Amino acid sequence: DLTEACGEKGQKTIVQGKSHVNFVESAGKLYFATHIGYYSIIDGMEKMGLPPEGWKPYPGGHLLAYDLKTGKFEDLGLAPDREGILTCNLDTQRGRLFGLTWPSGIFFRFELATRNLKSFGKRCADGEDGKGASYRTVCRSIAVDPGSGSAWFTTSEGAILRYRSDTDAVEPVVGEDMKKDYFGLYDPTSAGHMAYNW
């Protein structure tokens, strides 16, 4: 029960409905994150679930560690702005988790040793919470280079963004993108496809 693992059982908040991420093992623990599993259809689109009467809003996705020996969960922290965590990955060399939230596409970095979370803000216009020109599909994967500590993800317009561990900053990759003829042509402001995200 993910809601119980997050310490929210009996709190009558919208539950932790699923995990949408790859699980990564490091030092005998599996690291992963939770995501909302209860949605409301608003203007024909899935949005954060509106709580039924007597219930509280979704508290946000949790970063969790599962100890493979003891079978115990450890709650590491919450996603920025009470959003779900759509994807995450771990730099096992430096103990840094990287994530993207849903629906807004906030990119963040979390230090396991200090439990310091740094938000780099929305990286996908207004993400899947946007309407019209501000709508963008949020990337579903983050690649990590254990040698450099860099993390990469994409935008639906095809930009490749890189987190640099040496500067603790996010920057666009210059001179390369995901907008290739063989991927087809996409309107990044329309729903129903991943656009130029990998």
Regions found by a protein language model. Name each.
Residues 30-32, 96-99, 150-153:
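Conserved beta-propeller blade signature
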Residues 36-38, 103, 157:
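Residue-level signature of beta-propeller blades and closely related beta-rich strand-turn architectures
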Residues 61-64, 106-108, 159-161:
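A short loop-to-beta-strand structural motif that recurs across blades of beta-propeller domains
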